Amino acid sequence: MARVKRGVIARKRHKKILKLAKGYYGARSRVFRVAKQAVIKAGQYAYRDRRQKKRQFRALWIARINAGARNNGLSYSRLIAGLKKASIEIDRKVLADLAVNEKAAFAAIVEKAKATLA
């Protein structure tokens, strides 16, 4: 059986990694050995941050809802408790959007929560 040298396979592997590293600074986009490490690290960051993104957005929504609720004389925790009691099922993403863009609608929701708590 004929001996197969790895030229074609190695070139393909290198091109794939260097393509993924396109736009990286300095040797990270040109030297295979460095580029491979950079691509692996980038993948680790991407994996981790896809999970962190969900936590960070939830925290942002809560901060916005809290600010809007306090402008209407209620704390975040009291607002959420009031909404649960009133059986109003609006998720935090929508509540945050209302608090920022539709202040009148958000105020009406807060008033319903207040009425349920009283």
Curated annotation (Swiss-Prot):
Entry keywords, A to Z: Ribonucleoprotein, Ribosomal protein, RNA-binding, rRNA-binding
Molecular-function GO terms, alphabetical: rRNA binding; structural constituent of ribosome
Keyword Transcription regulation annotated: no
Lineage top rank: taxon: Bacteria
Entry keyword annotation includes Signal: no
A Pfam family that the UniProt record links to this protein: Ribosomal_L20
Coiled coil stretches, renumbered: none
Gene Ontology terms describing biological process: ribosomal large subunit assembly; translation
A cellular-component GO term for this protein: ribonucleoprotein complex
Family of the protein in this entry: Belongs to the bacterial ribosomal protein bL20 family.
PANTHER family for the chain: 39S RIBOSOMAL PROTEIN L20
Task performed by this protein: Binds directly to 23S ribosomal RNA and is necessary for the in vitro assembly process of the 50S ribosomal subunit. It is not involved in the protein synthesizing functions of that subunit.
Designated name of the protein: Large ribosomal subunit protein bL20
Organism, scientific name: Pseudomonas fluorescens (strain ATCC BAA-477 / NRRL B-23932 / Pf-5)
Lineage, broadest ranks: Bacteria, Pseudomonadati, Pseudomonadota, Gammaproteobacteria, Pseudomonadales
